[in-house]
């Protein structure tokens, strides 16, 4: 099958889910607009502030790009884990570890690779996301709990990627305590600074290492993240591959995988 035929087939596969996502956002906008009008008529103070639509031309481009990233991702369940190039981000709660039981001081922006954090004897849970992705940030407390409960048998890595909803791009309503105002990253320093902003709001356990994707977004592309995704690497292979976010981003599946494979060992420790 030729390249054009493959691209056409992928496009035809993406179109139905792309339009269903657009329909969901249109319904969401309608509900929010109706709520906004009701509050306005009641002269409620809650109406103060800008109302932002989710279904915009910028939003549609981002959604389409996310499906393309998922369709062309390198990562496959059971196959070799892509060893993407990333940079260190210091976790204020502790030092970055290289392998279980050892700690090294690292400098922000120091180059490394994703599999540098993998131990052949332990699974590595890799969580991809950004501060401006509400489904990702809302699950960070649950992710922190996973780290605390399973750090005796597994390693954890948070990979900070390109912003899902930058304030100067496809922004989301900022009426939540979980919301962040972060612009598009212009350089690696911007991305590391955004990661630090996230860590200041959500303190991760010291057992969780933190890195940032390079500005070429090679980790994002290889793992088909777009918004958020979680996977588990074991012996350099993909042992678990989570679904495409936001709708199929599921930390409960990660918990079940860890409990199934390591619950007995956790009880002994």
Curated annotation (Swiss-Prot):
<keyword id="KW-0712">Selenocysteine</keyword>
<dbReference type="InterPro" id="IPR036249">
    <property type="entry name" value="Thioredoxin-like_sf"/>
</dbReference>
<keyword id="KW-0893">Thyroid hormones biosynthesis</keyword>
<dbReference type="GO" id="GO:0042404">
    <property type="term" value="P:thyroid hormone catabolic process"/>
</dbReference>
<dbReference type="GO" id="GO:0004800">
    <property type="term" value="F:thyroxine 5'-deiodinase activity"/>
</dbReference>
<keyword id="KW-0560">Oxidoreductase</keyword>
<feature type="topological domain" description="Lumenal">
    <location>
        <begin position="1"/>
        <end position="9"/>
    </location>
</feature>
<feature type="active site">
    <location>
        <position position="133"/>
    </location>
</feature>
<keyword id="KW-0832">Ubl conjugation</keyword>
<protein>
    <recommendedName>
        <fullName>Type II iodothyronine deiodinase</fullName>
        <ecNumber>1.21.99.4</ecNumber>
    </recommendedName>
</protein>
<dbReference type="GO" id="GO:0042446">
    <property type="term" value="P:hormone biosynthetic process"/>
</dbReference>
<dbReference type="InterPro" id="IPR008261">
    <property type="entry name" value="Iodothyronine_deiodinase_AS"/>
</dbReference>
<comment type="function">
    <text>Plays a crucial role in the metabolism of thyroid hormones (TH) and has specific roles in TH activation and inactivation by deiodination.Catalyzes the deiodination of L-thyroxine (T4) to 3,5,3'-triiodothyronine (T3) and 3,3',5'-triiodothyronine (rT3) to 3,3'-diiodothyronine (3,3'-T2) via outer-ring deiodination (ORD). Catalyzes the deiodination of 3',5'-diiodothyronine (3',5'-T2) to 3'-monoiodothyronine (3'-T1) via ORD. Catalyzes the phenolic ring deiodinations of 3,3',5'-triiodothyronamine and 3',5'- diiodothyronamine.</text>
</comment>
<keyword id="KW-1133">Transmembrane helix</keyword>
<keyword id="KW-0256">Endoplasmic reticulum</keyword>
<dbReference type="GO" id="GO:0005789">
    <property type="term" value="C:endoplasmic reticulum membrane"/>
</dbReference>
<dbReference type="GO" id="GO:0042403">
    <property type="term" value="P:thyroid hormone metabolic process"/>
</dbReference>
<feature type="transmembrane region" description="Helical; Signal-anchor for type III membrane protein">
    <location>
        <begin position="10"/>
        <end position="34"/>
    </location>
</feature>
<keyword id="KW-0812">Transmembrane</keyword>
<dbReference type="Pfam" id="PF00837">
    <property type="entry name" value="T4_deiodinase"/>
</dbReference>
<dbReference type="InterPro" id="IPR000643">
    <property type="entry name" value="Iodothyronine_deiodinase"/>
</dbReference>
<comment type="subunit">
    <text>Predominantly monomer. Can form homodimers but homodimerization is not essential for enzyme activity. Interacts with USP20 and USP33. Interacts with MARCHF6.</text>
</comment>
<feature type="topological domain" description="Cytoplasmic">
    <location>
        <begin position="35"/>
        <end position="269"/>
    </location>
</feature>
<keyword id="KW-0472">Membrane</keyword>
<comment type="similarity">
    <text>Belongs to the iodothyronine deiodinase family.</text>
</comment>
């Amino acid at each position: 099958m030729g390249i054009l035929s493959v691209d056409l087939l992928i496009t035809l596969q993406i179109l139905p889910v792309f339009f269903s996502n657009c329909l969901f956002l249109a319904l969401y906008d309608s509900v929010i607009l109706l709520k906004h009008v009701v509050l306005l008529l009641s002269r409620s103070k809650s109406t103060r502030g800008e109302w932002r639509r989710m279904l915009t031309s910028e939003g549609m481009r981002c959604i389409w790009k996310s499906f393309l990233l998922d369709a062309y991702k390198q990562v496959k369940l059971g196959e070799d884990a892509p060893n993407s190039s990333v940079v260190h981000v210091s976790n204020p709660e502790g030092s970055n570890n290289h392998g279980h039981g050892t700690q090294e001081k690292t400098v922000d922006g120091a180059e490394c690779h994703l599999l540098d954090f993998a131990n052949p004897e332990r699974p590595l849970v890799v969580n991809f996301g950004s501060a401006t992705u509400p489904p990702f940030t809302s699950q960070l407390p649950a992710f922190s709990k996973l780290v605390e409960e399973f750090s005796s048998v597994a390693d954890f890595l948070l990979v900070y990627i390109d912003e899902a909803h930058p304030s100067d791009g496809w922004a989301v309503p900022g009426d939540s305590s979980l919301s962040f105002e972060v612009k598009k990253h212009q350089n690696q320093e911007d991305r590391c600074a955004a990661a630090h902003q996230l860590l200041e709001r959500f303190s991760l356990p010291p057992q969780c290492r933190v890195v940032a994707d390079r500005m070429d977004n090679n980790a994002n592309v290889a793992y088909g993240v777009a918004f958020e995704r979680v996977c588990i690497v074991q012996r350099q292979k993909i042992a678990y591959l989570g679904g495409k976010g936001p709708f199929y981003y599921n930390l409960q599946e990660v918990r079940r995988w860890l409990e199934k494979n390591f619950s007995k060992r956790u009880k002994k420790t």
